[in-house]
Amino acid sequence: MAEPRTVRENANTLSSVQLAEILPHRYPFALVDRVLDYEPGQWAIGRKCVTRNAEFFNGHFPAQPVMPGVLLLEALAQTGAVAALSLPENKGKLALFGGIKSARFRKQVTPGDVLTLHCELVQQHGAVGVGKASAWVDGKCAVTAELTFALTEAAE
């Protein structure tokens, strides 16, 4: 497994407000708090602060809260969507899940963890692309996956 990309000295960052201009996701499904660095059309590094107040912890699992794996994958997909949708020609489009390949869950993510989300776009043919993604907590890999996405026009 490759080490994650590091944040550059002169990073391109996005606050939560700026992120909301690119991604359509809103509470409770906005799973990236901010972007630490990104290169449009190539890669993005996001941050998610996992709090005990997240609604999914009420049922997964009350006595031993663990962030659901599908939500980790969604957070990675949203990070990749930042890279794809930050290109001027993709402004206002949606990035939809097309598939998940080779997902591996390596570490549980629990309340108090800070996720560093990495997604690198490795292929794109027309509106369909592939991203290699990983999420890290305290320097340890929590999940890796290859994600397929499709870009589409957003409804007005």
Model-flagged regions — what are they?
Residues 1-32:
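N-terminal leader/capping segments at the start of a protein or of a new domain
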Residues 20, 63, 105-107:
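Beta-strand-rich interaction surfaces with strong enrichment in secreted/lumenal proteins
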Residues 27-67:
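Catalytic strand-loop segment that frames the active site of acyl-thioester-processing enzymes
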Residues 35, 101-138:
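Hydrophobic beta-sheet segments that form the core/acyl-binding groove
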Residues 35, 66-90:
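Active-site helix/loop of acyl-thioester processing domains in fatty-acid/polyketide metabolism
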